[in-house]
Amino acid sequence: DCPSDWSPYGQYCYKFFQQKMNWADAERFCSEQAKGGHLVSFQSDGETDFVVNLVTEKIQSSDLYAWIGLRVQNKEKQCSSKWSDGSSVSYENVVGRTVKKCFALEKEQEFFVWINIYCGQQNPFVCKSPPP
C-alpha cells in the first residue's frame, strides 16, 4: 500500500510536488522521500496518462513544466537517454534532441508532451517509488 498522500498505479506510488527545484535536486529529493524513489519514469501509455492526470489536477496554472526522470547522458562519444531510476527508455514520447539535457512534461493546452529543457530550471516534479 502507498502512503496516504501518494497515489497508486500498477506496482508503484506517485506524488506531485509543488515546490520548485532543478532536475538534480528534484531527483535527490525523490530519493529521500522513499526507499527506491526517483523522478517519475514511464513504461507505458497508461502510466503516462495516470501521471499526466495527477499533474493536471495539482499543478498551478502559471507552471508550464514538471520534471520527469529522463536525462540525456553523455558517455564518451555516445549519447544515451536513461531514466533516473536506471531503467532504459523502451517507451518514448519525444521529439527532437538539443543541448538541453533534462526532460519535463510541458503543458500544451490540456495535453502534456515531453520536452527537453535546461537542467538548472526550477520546476515542480513527480516522484515515483515502490510501496514501502
Curated annotation (Swiss-Prot):
Tissue specificity: Expressed by the venom gland.
Cellular component annotations (GO), alphabetically ordered: extracellular region
Key words, A-Z: Blood coagulation cascade inhibiting toxin, Disulfide bond, Hemostasis impairing toxin, Platelet aggregation inhibiting toxin, Secreted, Toxin
Record-annotated disulphide pairs: C2-C13, C30-C127, C102-C119
C-type lectin domain segment(s): 9-128
Pfam families for the chain: Lectin_C
Compartments it resides in: Secreted
PROSITE patterns: C_TYPE_LECTIN_1, C_TYPE_LECTIN_2
Record keyword Disulfide bond present: yes
InterPro entries: C-type_lectin-like, C-type_lectin-like/link_sf, C-type_lectin/snaclec_domain, C-type_lectin_CS, CTDL_fold
Subcellular location, principal: secreted
GO MF assignments: toxin activity
The keyword Zinc is assigned to this record: no
PANTHER family, sorted: MANNOSE, PHOSPHOLIPASE, LECTIN RECEPTOR RELATED
Function: Thrombin and prothrombin (F2) inhibitor. The IC(50) of thrombin-induced platelet aggregation and fibrinocoagulation is 62 and 35 nM, respectively. Its inhibitory activity is at least 10-fold lower than that observed for other thrombin inhibitors.
Similarity field: Belongs to the snaclec family.
Record text on subunit structure and interactions: Heterodimer of subunits alpha and beta; disulfide-linked.
Protein's recorded name: Snaclec bothroinsularin subunit alpha
